[in-house]
Each structure stands twice: as C-alpha cells, then as structure tokens.
Amino acid sequence: MVMENEEIRYVRRRKQMVENQIARRGINDPFVLGAMGTVPRHLFVSEALMDQAYGDFPLPIGEQQTISQPYIVAEMTQALEPTGNDRVLEIGTGSGYQAAILSRIVSRVYTVERIHSLYIRARALFDRLGYYNIATRYSDGTTGWKAESPFDRIIITAGAPDIPSVLVDQLAVGGRLVAPVGTESVQSLIKLVKEKTGVRSTDLGGCRFVKLIGEHGWKEN
C-alpha cells in the first residue's frame, strides 16, 4: 500500500509538472505533453533527489552533469517537431531522460554518451523501463553516429561553441537539429532546418547547459 501511494504521488506530481510548468508556458504539442506526463522522471535521478524530480529546475546526476529542467526538455523536444516515423540522434545521453521522452514519440532513438558511468546507468534504466527503441553508444558524441545516418532529427543536450558540421552532414534533408550554442557559460537555443540549398537557423532564446566535450566541441580541462 505504501508503494502504491508513493506511485500515485509521483503520478500527481508529474501531472502538475505538465500543467503548471510546461503547458502554461506554451508547449502545446500533444505528443510532447503526453510523453512528459508518462515518463517517470524521478527514476532518472538518485533516490535522494526523487522528491525534487518534478520541480522546475535541473538536478545533478553525478560526473558534474545534470538532468535538464522539465520545461527545457519539453521546449527542445517540441522544437524538433518530432513525428512517429522519425529516427532521432541524441548527443549526450546523460541521465537518459531526454532520450526516454523522445522514445515515446518517435520510431527510434540513437543516443551517444562519452561518460562511461552515465552510459551504463542509462542503458540499464532503458532496459528496466522497457524502452527498447533506444539504441545506446559509448563514444564521443560530437562525431555523431555515421553508421546509422542520416537522421531525421538531431538533438544536442550540452552547450557547443558551434554546431559541428559532421552532425549537420548526418542530418537528412528536411531534418531538424536543436542545440544550445554559445560560450562555456551561456548559450542560445538554436534550431536548424536542413534544406536542399543549405541550412536555415532560428534563435529560440537563451539557455544554459554544461559544456559539450569532444573532438568537435569544447576541449576537456
């Protein structure tokens, strides 16, 4: 009974998160709202932080990394304009929460993580939750996943100095890429659309992410 009541409490908090933090701030894609209301965010943080999981703020996940605040996850997901047939590449698995959200909307998610402990933890959690349409890879995400390209959508979940051209090359024509781009401390959320004649970009506003480390990102200190 205690476990049942605890689960009901998390369901209620998840519903409040969607209504108060996400829908009220302009996220209106029903598939994004549905995914945010379904995926158990509290399982993607440590047990000590579970009670804070549905708050409107990022949380530490170890290795100097964070799980993004719910609104940012929803905003980036909606900006991708995901559809049910899409194959999506995620750069920076982290906690696995963003990939889990996408997996409830699209056909298949390919996610790359450079930190081994986070990669192992996320992969185990995907298996535990039955998210079998997520493929994981332990590698430098800034180089993408060429063998599985082209991708319909690409999402970068860490702040980059620029959008790596190698990732644009792995994006299908007509595809969307969303990434935080800027300095090490503050970025703008950029949406890129790849067309036959080139790329078109839109600035969606300011944001702040941990650094994108790798061959085509920031260098590790």
From Swiss-Prot:
Active site per the UniProt annotation: 68
Reaction it catalyzes: [protein]-L-isoaspartate + S-adenosyl-L-methionine = [protein]-L-isoaspartate alpha-methyl ester + S-adenosyl-L-homocysteine
Compartments it resides in: Cytoplasm
Keyword S-adenosyl-L-methionine: yes
Gene Ontology BP terms: methylation; protein modification process; protein repair
Keyword field: Cytoplasm, Methyltransferase, S-adenosyl-L-methionine, Transferase
GO molecular function, one term: protein-L-isoaspartate (D-aspartate) O-methyltransferase activity
GO cellular component, one term: cytoplasm
SUPFAM superfamilies the UniProt entry points to: S-adenosyl-L-methionine-dependent methyltransferases
Superkingdom of origin: Bacteria
Keyword NADP: no
Main location: cytoplasm
Function: Catalyzes the methyl esterification of L-isoaspartyl residues in peptides and proteins that result from spontaneous decomposition of normal L-aspartyl and L-asparaginyl residues. It plays a role in the repair and/or degradation of damaged proteins.
Similarity comment: family membership: Belongs to the methyltransferase superfamily. L-isoaspartyl/D-aspartyl protein methyltransferase family.
NCBIfam families: pimt, PRK00312.1
Listed name of the protein: Protein-L-isoaspartate O-methyltransferase
Species the sequence originates in: Desulfosudis oleivorans (strain DSM 6200 / JCM 39069 / Hxd3)
Phylogenetic placement of the source organism: Bacteria, Pseudomonadati, Thermodesulfobacteriota, Desulfobacteria, Desulfobacterales
Gene: pcm
